[in-house]
Amino acid sequence: MTACIVGWAHSRFGKLEGETLENLIVKVATDALDHAGIGPDEVDEIVLGHFNAGFSAQDFTASLVLQADDRLRFKPVTRVENACATGSAAVRQGIRAIDANAARIVLVVGAEQMTTTPGPEIGKNLLKASYLPEDGETPAGFAGVFGKIAQAYFQRYGDQSDALAMIAAKNHKNGVDNPYAQMRKDFGYEFCRQESEKNPFVAGPLKRTDCSLVSDGAAALILADTATALKMRRAVAFRANEHVQDFLPMSKRDILTFEGCEQAWNRALKSAGVTLDDLSFVETHDCFTIAELIEYEAMGLAKPGEGAKLALEGTTAKDGRLPVNPSGGLKAKGHPIGATGVSMHVLTAMQLVGEAGGIQVPGAKLGGIFNMGGAAVANYVSILDRIR
């Protein structure tokens, strides 16, 4: 692969009062160009990741990126969508443009504004990332979908509530030191483990602390070909970038194995010529704690049904053998859908150049990313390596 990350920007995630989707997009696009030291006239292509699905009345959003600078006018811009993996779909589109020699420098932006939407509509919008004939009437929205997955996992492998609480507590603890995170509070294991008025059950065995947040936010990357990147201030290369798409209906697959996730990881590791033991850390898609648990198994870190051991033994803690979600993950950082995949790449690049501040993994050399759309339907894995 020839694409490298040479600059980035990241907004705070959360309920951003007074912000608009346009402002979020413009700010990160401008800041990313400045961070890379790239002029708008040097950009060859632009990709915007924006899920929307009813969150914004402005559905045609591609050209909002051009508002960042008049010199971007007439540049080709494409908006992409692939459910909660929309951001990674945008990143991949940019990589492919560079790998095909169709572009030298690509601006990638991911953004979403969700918190201005009334609560009941949020659930309906998110369910659009499921197979509606089967799941369209699921109570509790997408939490209900993953509640069913968690219940099925418990039935097959036993009650895993201790492990889910440990995952939630880990990610909240990590998120305290992330300045971009929506929820910077260490709730602790006991709070996450116990049902309470402040932590009620939401769907099946999933409590509030098992669910990611509804968020506003944006992130951006500047991608460049390797020759250009090596002349820049910094360069983080894609050792691998893989995309695997699975069936949408859960009835057509074993939903407890996340086979698309497994396939994407296998292909990425083979492409990069590395193993999980070579990775310094992983940012993975913890839309719900049960998702992170199953992802441990799908990526090959644990055998089926044994992912809980990793959480309970501290293997995936920040000081563990393979830190998972040192950023706090979607659980603490927030999950503005179109921005999430781009954010994961920004924060991984920051780790690799030693600019991650309080969430820095000491000596990070190689970072893995898994971003998922739907219930393991759209699956993206990147492996990043600093080369400058």
Features from the language model and the residues they span:
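Buried hydrophobic positions in well-ordered alpha/beta secondary-structure cores of metabolic enzymes
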Residues: 6, 32, 43-46, 87, ...
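Conserved catalytic cysteine-centered active-site region
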Residues: 4, 52-109, 113-145, 184-213, ...
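Conserved active-site "lid/cap" helical segment
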Residues: 1-85, 149, 153-160, 182-192, ...
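Short glycine/threonine-rich loop-to-helix capping motif typified by GTGT followed
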Residues: 53-61, 250-254, 286-309, 320, ...
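Beta-strand segments within the central parallel beta-sheet cores of soluble alpha/beta enzyme folds
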Residues: 41-50, 76-82, 106-110, 162-169, ...
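Condensing-enzyme catalytic core mediating Claisen C-C bond formation in acyl metabolism
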Residues: 1-22, 132, 165-167, 200-263, ...
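Active-site-proximal alpha-helical scaffold in enzymes
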Residues: 81-112, 144-178, 221-227, 333-356
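Extended C-terminal subregions enriched in glycine
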Residues: 258, 262, 266-290, 298, ...
